[in-house]
Swiss-Prot record:
Family of this protein: Belongs to the IF-3 family.
Keyword Aminoacyl-tRNA synthetase (UniProt): no
GO molecular function: ribosome binding; translation initiation factor activity
NCBIfam families: infC
Gene name of the encoded protein: infC
Protein name, as recorded: Translation initiation factor IF-3
Protein task: IF-3 binds to the 30S ribosomal subunit and shifts the equilibrium between 70S ribosomes and their 50S and 30S subunits in favor of the free subunits, thus enhancing the availability of 30S subunits on which protein synthesis initiation begins.
Subunit description: Monomer.
Gene3D superfamilies, per the entry: Translation initiation factor 3 (IF-3), C-terminal domain, Translation initiation factor 3 (IF-3), N-terminal domain
Any single Pfam family the record assigns to this protein: IF3_N
Residues spanning the membrane: none
Primary location: cytoplasm
Amino acid sequence: MTIAKDSMVNDGIRAREVRLIASDGEQLGVKSRQEAMQIAEDASLDLVLVAPKAKPPVARIMDYGKYRFEQQKKDREARKKQKVVSIKEVRLSPAIDTNDFNTKLKHAEKFLSKGDKVRVSIRFKGRAITHKDIGRQVLNRMIEATKEFSTVEAYPKMDGRSMFLVLAPKTDK
C-alpha cells in the first residue's frame, strides 16, 4: 500500500472539515474531522477520503479493508480483459505458386481469426531484388484476399532485402 493511499484514511486525513457520507450512502452534511472520526469509530468502520479535491473534501464511512479488496478485484478483472496482441509472420517469396500462396493465406486467416496481427514478408534473394514490382504484386494479392476480415495497418514497404506489410484483424464496431 502506498503512502498516498494511507493518508486518505482515518488519522491521515488532513482537512479540518469534511462532507460526510454514511456507510449506507446517506449525506450527513459538513462535519469537523474529529466529529467524523468519532462517528466512524462508533460504527466500527473507517473514515475514507473519496474526493480530496472537492470543497470541502468528501469522506465516506466504510470498511477500508473491504474497499481495498474490491478495488484490487476490479483491477484484476480489468487486467484479465486486456488482450495482448502478438504479431505473427507469414513469409512468402516473389515467385510463389498459387497453391503455396493459398496455404500461406490460410495461415494468415487463422492468425487473424485468433485476433493476432500478421506481418506478411517477402525476402528477395540474389538478383530477385531487381523485381520489386513482382513482390509488391504478391503482397497486393494478399491484401485483396484478406480484405473481408482484415485491415492493412502498414502498407507494403522495403526494409533491406525484404518487403513487408502488416495486417490487423477487423474489429466489429
